[in-house]
């Protein structure tokens, strides 16, 4: 698979394919696109020859933009644009995020508004295709004048600014000069504007955000699948998902969520088909399901709408020219701009984190019903498998751990974009997006969320197996589940502890084995996009095409 860069058509799926899937990258052969790239570079060259004043070319930067740069200093000032930002340390940015950042910077430069040589873009592409990842740090960017610090470590590495910039390649950590030589390049000086064009953009925070969105959409898909398992374990009615209800309140996400849940539950033996005329109630319980099921479309719908909006914003940002100044090669104009302000990325990440917190809290509240006999419609206390011993406690500790994770996930959902310092960079960056903080927190939240969902899937498997045993005498839940949820059940069951067993639930006697390896098996499958992901692929594809 090869992703072609033209500055305008990169999708979240493309970014995911390169960042996490290792897909190859190519520069478009479109003559118009290439003409814009070459043309913008020619505009800068002519402006320098004429002695025009251009920010960051013939001046210093930011709050020192009143300082003029002489002709013999033009190259040095571009080196300084990068050199001065090798200024951080701390935790490294994961390779997938570095790859996304390189891809987005290359794509942005392909718009032909940045005034750089095509050779710089070719180097970014060469690094990507070779699997060479500059060592970049999480800290240092406020997402205002772009991601100056993290993008510096990428830009300086592809230029070979100094051997102190390190690159990971084929399991080794090498200096950038060695890596350049391995790839057939030599160090090169930046031309006027090029140093600034490499680090003055939103590629780092938006690259992190793009990877987050892929995981967040996966998580939302899993969450809906988990709810479908829970609904069948709790003897839910399908009436809550009847299209008539949601036609009366036609928010796109609500309508989508109801339709998908209806599809997931169709044919389930424990689902009361009230929409089909079955009005019988179970064991004299409430005439209607509790809110967690009955209001699922109304609760989950805004999450779907919000994630769709965030995904669209990140995808748009990935196809922008976002450095300063920008050049119009058709007219020769240069524009002093603010496209480097990553506010859309910051807001999208703040929103995503908040929505993921709501999503996990909903799941946590449903599990509380399933483990509590007063609310579970006949499930065993704490979903104990073997009640005969009298000492098994089932999933009590697992749910306590999920309580902890749900709280952490919710805490990480607090906004960041509104907490910017007004004094940044000599008061020049007196508004700033904090997009890198927002995106890094979102990645951290997704780490916890995937762990939470692994535990939720284990709970769902145990719940439907307990229900199956109550209803049929067999612990193999395929006997009761809807056709649409059988693949998810099988995938989760195998990832956690092997094939379904008619005689024993996945957690039978507490001392048969620990819960930890079961959760780890599910988490590994989720992280590798294994069988659980494959089982939900149709649902994930539906979410990909959904538009709020």
Curated annotation (Swiss-Prot):
Biotech applications: Is an attractive biocatalyst for the production of enantiopure phenylalanine analogs, such as 3,4-dimethoxy-L-phenylalanine which is a key building block for the anti-Parkinson drug L-DOPA.
- Give the position(s) of the covalent cross-link described as 5-imidazolinone (Ala-Gly): 144-146
What's the pH dependence, according to the entry?
Answer: Optimum pH is 9.5 for the ammonia elimination reaction from 3,4-dimethoxy-L-phenylalanine. Optimum pH is 9.0 for the ammonia addition reaction to 3,4-dimethoxy-(E)-cinnamate.
For this UniProt record, give its keywords in alphabetical order, as a comma-separated list. Answer: Lyase, Phenylalanine catabolism, Phenylpropanoid metabolism
Pathway per its UniProt entry is: Phenylpropanoid metabolism; trans-cinnamate biosynthesis; trans-cinnamate from L-phenylalanine: step 1/1
PTMs?
A: Contains an active site 4-methylidene-imidazol-5-one (MIO), which is formed autocatalytically by cyclization and dehydration of residues Ala-Ser-Gly.
Gene Ontology annotations of biological process type:
L-phenylalanine catabolic process; phenylpropanoid metabolic process
Coiled-coil regions, chain positions:
none
Keyword Lipid biosynthesis in annotation = no
The record's EC number reads 4.3.1.-
Lineage top rank: taxon: Bacteria
User: Which residues participate in (E)-cinnamate binding?
Assistant: 200, 288, 294, 324, 396, 425, 428
Gene3D superfamilies, per the entry:
Fumarase/aspartase (Central domain), Fumarase/aspartase (N-terminal domain)
Q: Which InterPro entries match?
A: Aromatic_Lyase, Fumarase/histidase_N, L-Aspartase-like
| Catalytic residues of the enzyme | 55
Describe the reaction catalysed, as an equation.
Answer: L-phenylalanine = (E)-cinnamate + NH4(+); L-tyrosine = (E)-4-coumarate + NH4(+); 3,4-dimethoxy-L-phenylalanine = 3,4-dimethoxy-(E)-cinnamate + NH4(+)
2,3-didehydroalanine (Ser) is carried by which residues? Answer: 145
Q: Which GO terms describe its molecular function?
A: ammonia-lyase activity
Temperature and activity: Is thermostable, showing a high melting temperature of 82 degrees Celsius.
Tell me which Pfam families the record gives. Answer: Lyase_aromatic
In terms of PANTHER family, this protein maps to: HISTIDINE AMMONIA-LYASE
By sequence similarity, the record places it as follows: Belongs to the PAL/histidase family.
What does the subunit comment say? Homotetramer.
What is the protein's given name? Aromatic ammonia-lyase
Instruction: Please tell me the species this chain comes from.
Output: Loktanella atrilutea
């Amino acid at each position: 698979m090869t992703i072609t860069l033209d500055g305008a058509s990169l999708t979240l799926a493309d970014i995911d394919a390169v960042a996490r899937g290792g897909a190859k990258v190519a520069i478009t052969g479109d003559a118009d696109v290439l003409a814009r790239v070459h043309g913008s570079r020619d505009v800068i060259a002519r402006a320098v020859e004429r002695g025009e004043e251009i920010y960051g070319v013939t001046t210093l930067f930011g709050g020192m933009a009143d300082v003029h740069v002489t002709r013999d200093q033009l190259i040095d000032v571009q080196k300084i644009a990068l050199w001065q930002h090798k200024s951080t340390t701390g935790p490294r940015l994961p390779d997938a995020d570095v790859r996304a950042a390189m891809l987005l910077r290359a794509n942005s430069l392909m718009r032909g508004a940045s005034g750089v040589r095509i050779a710089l873009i070719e180097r970014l592409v060469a690094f990507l295709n070779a699997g060479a990842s500059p060592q970049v740090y999480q800290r240092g960017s406020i997402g205002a004048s772009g991601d100056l610090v993290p993008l510096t470590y990428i830009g300086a590495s592809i230029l070979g600014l100094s051997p102190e910039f390190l690159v990971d390649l084929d399991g080794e950590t090498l200096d950038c000069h060695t890596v350049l030589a391995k790839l057939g390049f030599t160090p090169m000086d930046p031309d006027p504007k090029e140093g600034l064009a490499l680090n003055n953009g939103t590629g780092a925070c938006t690259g992190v955000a793009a990877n987050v969105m892929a995981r967040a959409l996966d998580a939302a898909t899993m969450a809906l699948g988990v709810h479908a398992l829970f609904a069948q374990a709790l003897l839910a009615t399908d009436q809550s998902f009847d299209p008539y209800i949601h036609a009366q309140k036609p928010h796109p996400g609500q309508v989508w969520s109801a339709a998908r849940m209806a599809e997931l539950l169709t044919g389930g033996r424990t689902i009361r088909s009230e929409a089909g005329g079955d009005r019988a109630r179970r064991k004299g319980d409430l005439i209607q399901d509790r809110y967690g099921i009955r209001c699922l479309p109304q609760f989950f719908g805004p999450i779907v709408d919000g994630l769709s909006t965030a995904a669209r914003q990140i995808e748009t940002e990935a196809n922008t020219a976002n450095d300063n100044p920008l050049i119009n090669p058709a007219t020769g104009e240069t524009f002093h701009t603010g496209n480097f302000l990553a506010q859309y990325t910051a807001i999208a990440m703040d929103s995503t984190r908040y929505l993921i917190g709501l999503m996990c809290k909903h799941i946590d509240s449903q599990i509380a019903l399933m483990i509590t006999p007063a609310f579970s419609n006949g499930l065993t206390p704490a979903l104990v498998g073997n009640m005969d011993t009298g000492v098994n406690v089932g999933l009590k500790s697992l749910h306590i751990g999920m309580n902890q994770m749900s709280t952490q996930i919710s805490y990480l959902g607090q906004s960041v974009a509104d907490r910017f310092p007004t004094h940044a960079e000599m008061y020049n960056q007196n508004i700033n997006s904090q997009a890198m903080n927002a995106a890094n927190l979102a990645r951290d939240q997704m780490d916890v969320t995937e762990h939470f969902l692994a535990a939720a899937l284990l709970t769902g498997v145990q719940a439907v197996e307990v229900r199956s045993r109550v209803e049929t005498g067999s612990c193999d839940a395929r006997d009761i589940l809807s056709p649409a949820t059988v693949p998810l059940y099988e995938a989760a069951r195998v990832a956690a502890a092997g094939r379904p067993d008619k005689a024993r639930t996945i957690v039978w006697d507490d001392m048969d084995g620990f819960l930890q390896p079961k959760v780890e098996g599910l988490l590994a499958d989720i992280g590798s996009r294994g069988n659980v992901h494959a089982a939900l692929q149709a649902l994930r594809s539906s979410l990909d095409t959904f538009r709020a």
